[in-house]
């Protein structure tokens, strides 16, 4: 009899626990606006992970450049990334992806070379201005809808750039990063245009292939250092697998579940994560004026993304 009571008690506790968990799940789903809201929440969290991965690569690439020249690094990085994409290819239509890859190649070239001349923190924040520049480029090239507030975002971003650079004259690294942001803005505008017609994974592969094939000739003639060691191999794997293959696959998949404005704001956290990783790994510190500049850049990105 005692055993029966204990058994009933256990069954009651189990049912009570299951019912409470179910109630919590239902309550959570309602709070998030239904099943679609939950999907959007998970998508936003996933995109935050993408921003974290991208932000972490700035100090990683800067470390790798101590042992390998910029074009050589990009050649090897994107060759490895292409290998990861191969199992997911569906056809060989390269036209649109290769076009985007040309803009990507120029963006990564300016970014990687620029990291030799500026801090990883500056590189991260200045690169994030591609969110501000993309709508302007879309309007100029594809005649997309233009919002006048995009202009205020650009102006605010340039003021932030001025303060982030120390307002005593721009260094070559920061200027190269600005060109990097310009071409990444073009890349985003082109992806928005062509992804309506093409498979996102195919676009990502051909982007990577274009960067690899265009970087290789420059690597042959400009490489002054090419040291393969454990640190460089680790940096290559982090940037090729996590920052290129995993991040691109996640981005292409998750952006279909959330609003583009939300995605842009979340991905702009790349600059914040770049700073946090740079402080932790490279012990980089900004002055109060530079922090103000970084804040203005982040604010500009939010204004353009949310149209506030």
Swiss-Prot record:
Any Gene Ontology CC annotation: plasma membrane
Transmembrane segments: 45-65, 69-89, 100-120, 122-142, 151-171, 172-192, 201-221, 226-246, 263-283, 285-305
Domain EamA: 52-166, 178-306
Key words, A-Z: Cell membrane, Membrane, Repeat, Transmembrane, Transmembrane helix, Transport
Entry membrane topology: Multi-pass membrane protein
InterPro entries the record matches: Diverse_Substrate_Transporter, EamA_dom
SUPFAM superfamilies in UniProt: Multidrug resistance efflux transporter EmrE
Organism domain of life: Archaea
Protein localization: Cell membrane
Similarity annotation: Belongs to the EamA transporter family.
Designated name of the protein: Uncharacterized transporter AF_0788
Source organism phylogeny: Archaea, Methanobacteriati, Methanobacteriota, Archaeoglobi, Archaeoglobales
């Amino acid at each position: 009899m005692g055993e029966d009571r204990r058994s009933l008690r256990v069954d009651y506790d189990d049912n009570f626990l299951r019912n409470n968990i179910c109630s919590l799940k239902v309550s959570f789903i309602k709070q998030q606006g239904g099943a679609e809201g939950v999907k959007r929440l998970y998508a936003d969290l996933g995109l935050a992970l993408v921003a974290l991965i991208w932000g972490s690569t700035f100090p990683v690439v800067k470390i790798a450049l101590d042992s390998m020249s910029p074009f050589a690094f990009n050649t090897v990085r994107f060759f490895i990334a292409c290998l990861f994409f191969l199992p997911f290819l569906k056809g060989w239509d390269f036209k649109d992806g290769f076009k985007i890859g040309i803009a990507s190649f120029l963006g990564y070239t300016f970014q990687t070379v620029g990291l030799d001349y500026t801090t990883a923190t500056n590189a991260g924040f200045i690169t994030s201005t591609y969110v501000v520049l993309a709508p302007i480029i879309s309007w100029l090239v594809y005649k997309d809808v233009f919002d006048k507030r995009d202009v205020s975002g650009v102006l605010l971003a340039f003021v932030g750039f001025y303060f982030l650079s120390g307002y005593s004259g721009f260094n070559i690294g920061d200027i190269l990063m600005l060109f990097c942001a310009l071409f990444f803005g073009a890349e985003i505008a082109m992806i928005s245009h062509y992804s309506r017609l093409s498979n996102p994974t195919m676009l990502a592969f051909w982007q990577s292939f274009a960067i690899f094939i265009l970087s290789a000739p420059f690597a042959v003639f400009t490489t002054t250092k090419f040291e393969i060691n454990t640190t460089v191999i680790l940096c290559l794997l982090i940037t090729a697998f996590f920052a290129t293959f995993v991040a691109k696959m996640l981005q292409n998949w998750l952006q279909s579940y959330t609003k583009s404005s939300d995605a842009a704001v979340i991905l702009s956290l790349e600059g914040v994560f770049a700073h946090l990783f740079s402080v932790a790994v490279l012990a980089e510190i900004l002055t109060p004026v530079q922090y103000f500049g970084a804040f203005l850049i982040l604010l500009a990105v939010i204004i353009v993304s949310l149209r506030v």
